[in-house]
């Protein structure tokens, strides 16, 4: 929120009261989830179409309050072309005492990668450009020591020019319930995170990129498991059962015992699975879809892969400023998280306006 308090107006949409600054007009609901509802709006100040998200019960519990603080801190930190950033954050409250609602404003993104894949099988050049942008955004996110954890086609927004932004990063802390059954939430998940094998690292996101890339190349979900076990079987059928070296790294004894009970399977020849694909694409997939996360390619390494020769520019693949997430280990009361969040709202400085965007 800027220092001059704007004039707010109230309106009811889908049984929710929205109280927003006058600059945001023509609010229309576009969706709602567990953590809030989203309206499309027209920003009269910039001429941009924006998404306004009203967080639902942001301070109802310590978990909610910490999540609210986390989301705001993350969005404020992200300043990269391939990562969703914050255009504005506001509250109708005039003081900390009456602070109960948080609204976040981001670019309104038309389609997501799901819509794109459903409509058409993509050319190899499209796949190069889309995956290059995902990796460019991931290099930035990972450099801040943030793990997305939930990369999937519906979390990748794409506009008419095929320009891509990563959404909803670093927030995902999925419940077992949301991961159960025939659900996309799990199809793109690295095995070590899905099955709690071990402490995971940033390359869980690279596994997801491999799954997404395979889907763009073939038009089919790579591992559409019906449950955790079926999912693991589909994965192992392609990449082979773990060898002794990886088994040693799996800290969960039950997971180790289960894997050892399975019939040994060799890794398939990816060229026979992705018939007709660019051999460089197949080579990159083999480096991403590696069971041992220590041996998986990183985002920075993948950007330098020959598959992206026409897009790779080492001078234009920026890293993030350091991101202080020491708050993650803090145990605070609701009012303390709320006060920290209020400070973040008040201190927000809007990004400089991008001329190109305003003209488009």
Swiss-Prot record:
Protein name from the UniProt record: Mitogen-activated protein kinase 14
Protein residues bound to ATP: 30-38, 53
UniProt-reported outcome of changing residue 322 to R: In a lung adenocarcinoma sample; somatic mutation
Effect of residue 168 to A: Loss of kinase activity
Role description: Serine/threonine kinase which acts as an essential component of the MAP kinase signal transduction pathway. MAPK14 is one of the four p38 MAPKs which play an important role in the cascades of cellular responses evoked by extracellular stimuli such as pro-inflammatory cytokines or physical stress leading to direct activation of transcription factors. Accordingly, p38 MAPKs phosphorylate a broad range of proteins and it has been estimated that they may have approximately 200 to 300 substrates each. (Microbial infection) Activated by phosphorylation by M.tuberculosis EsxA in T-cells leading to inhibition of IFN-gamma production; phosphorylation is apparent within 15 minutes and is inhibited by kinase-specific inhibitors SB203580 and siRNA.
N6-acetyllysine modifications at: 53, 152
Domain of life: Eukaryota
Post-translational modification: Dually phosphorylated on Thr-180 and Tyr-182 by the MAP2Ks MAP2K3/MKK3, MAP2K4/MKK4 and MAP2K6/MKK6 in response to inflammatory citokines, environmental stress or growth factors, which activates the enzyme. Dual phosphorylation can also be mediated by TAB1-mediated autophosphorylation. TCR engagement in T-cells also leads to Tyr-323 phosphorylation by ZAP70. Dephosphorylated and inactivated by DUPS1, DUSP10 and DUSP16. PPM1D also mediates dephosphorylation and inactivation of MAPK14.
PANTHER family: MITOGEN-ACTIVATED PROTEIN KINASE
Main localization (coarse): cytoplasm
Placement of sequence motif TXY: 180-182
Keyword Phosphoprotein belongs to the record: yes
Residues with N-acetylserine modification: 2
Cofactor field: Mg(2+)
A GO term, aspect molecular function: mitogen-activated protein kinase p38 binding
Known EC number: 2.7.11.24
Reactions listed under catalytic activity: L-seryl-[protein] + ATP = O-phospho-L-seryl-[protein] + ADP + H(+); L-threonyl-[protein] + ATP = O-phospho-L-threonyl-[protein] + ADP + H(+)
Reported impact of residue 180 to E: Loss of kinase activity
Family named by the database record: Belongs to the protein kinase superfamily. CMGC Ser/Thr protein kinase family. MAP kinase subfamily.
Activity regulation, short description: Activated by cell stresses such as DNA damage, heat shock, osmotic shock, anisomycin and sodium arsenite, as well as pro-inflammatory stimuli such as bacterial lipopolysaccharide (LPS) and interleukin-1. Activation occurs through dual phosphorylation of Thr-180 and Tyr-182 by either of two dual specificity kinases, MAP2K3/MKK3 or MAP2K6/MKK6, and potentially also MAP2K4/MKK4, as well as by TAB1-mediated autophosphorylation.
InterPro entries attached to this UniProt entry: Kinase-like_dom_sf (IPR011009), MAP_kinase (IPR050117), MAP_kinase_CS (IPR003527), MAPK14 (IPR038784), MAPK_p38-like (IPR008352), Prot_kinase_dom (IPR000719), Protein_kinase_ATP_BS (IPR017441)
Consequence of substituting residue 51 to V: In a gastric adenocarcinoma sample; somatic mutation
Active-site residues annotated for this sequence: 168
Residues annotated with Phosphothreonine modification: 16, 180, 263
Organ and tissue specificity: Brain, heart, placenta, pancreas and skeletal muscle. Expressed to a lesser extent in lung, liver and kidney.
Location in the cell: Cytoplasm; Nucleus
Organism: Homo sapiens
